[in-house]
Amino acid sequence: PGANLSRTNLTLRASSTFGKDDRWSIDAKVQYINTLAENRPISGARGNNAFYTIFNMPTTIDIRDFSSPVKDEFGEMIWWSKGGINPYWSKDYNPNKDSRNRFLMNGSLKYKFTDWLDAEIKAGSDMYFTEGEEKLYAGSPTNNKNSRYSTSEKKFFENNFSFLISGHKDELFGKFGGNFSFGGNLMERKSTGLDNAMGKLTAPDLFSLANGDKKDLSITETYIHKKINSLYGTLGINYNGWAFLDATFRNDWSSALNKENRSFFYPSVSLSWVISDMVGKVGKGMPEWFTYAKARASFAQVGNDMDAYQLYNTYSIGSDPNGNTTAGQGKTKYDADVRSELITSWEAGAELKFFNNRLGVDFAWYKTNAKRQLMNIPLNNLSGYDNMKVNAGNIQNTGIEIMLNARPIETAQFSWDTQLNFSQNKSKIIELLPGKPGMQYALGGSDALQVYAVAGGAYGEIWGTKYQRVEEGEFKGQLLLNESGLPQATSDKHKIGEQQPDFLLGWTNTFNYKNFTLSFLIDGRFGGDIFSFTNMNLQRSGIAECTAPGGKREDIVVAGVIKDGNGYKVNDQSVSLERYYKALATGRAGI
């Protein structure tokens, strides 16, 4: 409620050619973007997220009953429970707003030496200034009924200066033609930020950072400065218009790495062979129904650096509960000798067209290996750090991509184009750290549920607790219930799923009739697992359909056994559906 977003764009562009034979050309563009936002929705499973509280609201309650009034005679929010937030109250008493002014400027100057050789210089700048404000009025349970005030400022700019010399000439030597380019780029990026928050206002609803105790004031300053200098180039050779060899290179020098490892080089090579053109020029030509045939193969490497200030451990300034200045170290141990990441890929494929381009197929196979990845591996807490930045890992992805396209119908006024895309990717963690098979690296998650990269496994495995079961004997495999007849979670985590889908499938159709076009896409992701925290919370709150099968909530007897002095006995205790689903959704991730 009350959300509003307005955006204003202004663009000015000018271009011209001049000089002898119009060999000089200039192009300049300036763009201004102003964005104003009010009451952006708060996301996540948090008490001040109105949508989160609505999801967990009993269906027997009409939310419109809380639209007016939203505050009682004591100034406190009116809501159906002690937790969560009334969305109508949030609109007026937990507002937020932000504004951004962004400027994009770029210009180029180009000179043509000949009809096949030219040079160009470019300059570009991207800068924006953002201001934000958030207010929380007194009476909300999300801040112990205290009011809160916060502001934020951010400044960002990135400048790029580049040059490029390029040339292209057919029949350079006999039937050989070629092209080349050589250039460079200077990139500089800088950002600053200031976040202020007064967690508890002394005078309620008087929104000032000075209205409160210093111990409740939080100030966070950020400063990031990074540069990357680059040289790059391309070289292409073609023979008679049907055989093509292309190569590229790039070398970056990043300020985020130390002097010894600051430079990193990555090349690529590709070869393509247009078989149909070759046959047409040196032979009798392709059959009439066989329109086009092309084969291709490529090798490429890509290097990546990291964010600034991750080489040396420094101390950050803060304060203790009494307001005294303190200095503390971060939780990550840095290594000044880390290098850039390296991603190596191989690809091969073919493209075929039939019946004057009415039917076509494109097939590709690829393999990529990401090595020397910049990772934060866990450390023993006795070291004083939680993790350490290292180069490690070898993650391999292999897959295929197939595209079928056809024009089944074509008349003077109507045509139908259809395209079917299929892709399949298989990932494997070849290695995380040398000599540590089976090592787990956390990618994200919450408490009992984690997404891991596991050495020897697939990327993005889902690990979590499972139901406790009897491991041997007469009742082997049955649920091991607690004394109340409810399921129990294992103490350790197990692999319970994989994020990776079995394959992706997409179908696009385009219909053209005279000057009208209609197009639609059907896209599908088949296989793969997800864990839904939304469903878990709905079950815990009794909102999910499964918590009242057939619209009834009758007690159930969970199938399983209970441990007793003589071993196990079959469970005969009945429990309410409320207790059952709360047991399943225990903690933050449930069983």
Where are these regions (language model features)?
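Transmembrane beta-barrel architecture of outer membranes
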Residues: 5-11, 230, 264-268
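C-terminal transmembrane beta-barrel domains of outer membrane proteins
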Residues: 245, 296-297, 363
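Short, solvent-exposed loop/turn segments at secondary-structure boundaries
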Residues: 2-4, 257-261, 423
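Transmembrane beta-strand segments that form the barrel wall of outer-membrane beta-barrel proteins
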Residues: 1, 245-254, 408
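Surface-exposed loop/interface segments of Gram-negative outer-membrane beta-barrel transport/assembly proteins
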Residues: 15-102, 122-229, 256-257, 277-345, ...
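Residues on the lipid-exposed face of transmembrane beta-strands in outer-membrane beta-barrel proteins
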Residues: 12-16, 105-111, 163-167, 182, ...
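Glycine-rich, acidic and aromatic/proline-enriched surface loops and short helix-turn segments
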Residues: 1, 237-241, 368
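Glycine-rich, aromatic-lined ligand/substrate-binding cores of catalytic
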Residues: 498-533
